Regions:
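Short beta-strands within extracellular/lumenal beta-sheet-rich domains
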Residues: 75-104
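N-terminal leader/pro-regions and domain N-caps
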Residues: 14-75
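Short, low-complexity, Pro/Ser/Thr/Gly-rich segments in the mature regions of secreted, periplasmic
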Residues: 209-222
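A short beta-strand element within beta-rich, extracytoplasmic domains
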Residues: 103-120
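Short, surface-exposed beta-strand/strand-loop-strand elements in extracellular ectodomains
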Residues: 121-139
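Cysteine-clustered segments with highest specificity for TGF-beta superfamily mature ligands
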Residues: 152-211
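Extended, low-complexity, turn-rich repeat/linker tracts enriched in Gly/Pro/Ser/Thr and Asp/Glu
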Residues: 115-126, 195-199
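N-terminal Sec signal peptide cleavage junction
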Residues: 5, 12-14
């Protein structure tokens, strides 16, 4: 949708300068407990057992690292990192918006709406970081991946929606990437599950969607 036309490019007039608003549509990912396996020796009637470690050592497990904290074996946080949705192509978004914008001089992520529903997790999930990277990126640790923002923590079993906190540096890097000619990007999410003795054995999952609103500034064909 064409939003404005004016001298937004340092002297350019309405004949060749336009501002358009684009939306990526919902990009979806799952936060699940499937990767968190609790060894039998750490289970006690549906909860994380309190296993003493008087010598400062905890049982060795292949599935869940443990640390001796205050004399009790405490599971270390388990990181969860997943892809978010599909590759987003800004050229396609421009075409679908039926704009006449052909040369992009800057973009700005103005809003990222999120929704977490349904949420069947029986444990709280801390803040969820959302990242963007080139379409060739295989994960968060790949070159050219930047943090785009943070979704607030999700309480167990609670559906949530709202606006993600946007990282200004990550948004600026996304603008440089798109202006540089690579219009295809993908997204990733990262959070963790941190369990304490006495917590329930983790189960369930949450479906989370993010939808970016982007302001694109550019020019029409000259």
């Amino acid at each position: 949708m064409l939003l404005a036309c004016g001298a937004v490019l340092g002297g350019a007039g309405c004949n060749n300068a336009v501002v358009v608003q684009l939306m990526t549509g919902n990009q979806t990912f799952e936060v699940t407990t499937s990767s968190v396996e609790i060894p039998a020796q750490l289970q006690a009637e549906g909860t994380i057992a309190s296993v003493p470690c008087p010598t400062g050592m905890c049982p060795s497990t292949d599935t869940l690292p443990l640390a001796c904290v205050s004399g009790v074996c405490d599971p270390e946080p388990r990181t969860i990192a997943v892809p978010v949705g599909d590759v987003v192509d800004f050229d396609v978004l421009l075409r679908e918006a039926s704009t006449i914008l052909r040369f992009v001089d800057a973009i700005e992520v103005t809003r990222v709406q999120y929704a977490a529903s349904p949420n069947s997790l029986n444990v709280d999930v801390p803040d969820i970081e959302v990242f963007w990277g080139p379409d060739t990126a295989a994960g968060i640790d790949a070159p050219g991946v930047f943090r785009l923002g943070v979704i607030p923590a999700l309480p167990a079993g609670t559906a949530r929606e709202g606006d993600m906190q946007i990282d200004a540096d990550g948004s600026a890097a996304l603008s440089d990437h798109v202006v540089g000619g690579n219009r295809r990007v993908r997204f990733f999410a990262r959070t963790s599950i941190d369990l304490d003795p006495g917590d329930p054995i983790p189960m369930g999952g949450a479906t989370v969607t993010v939808n970016l609103t982007v302001r694109a500034i550019g020019r029409i064909l000259e």
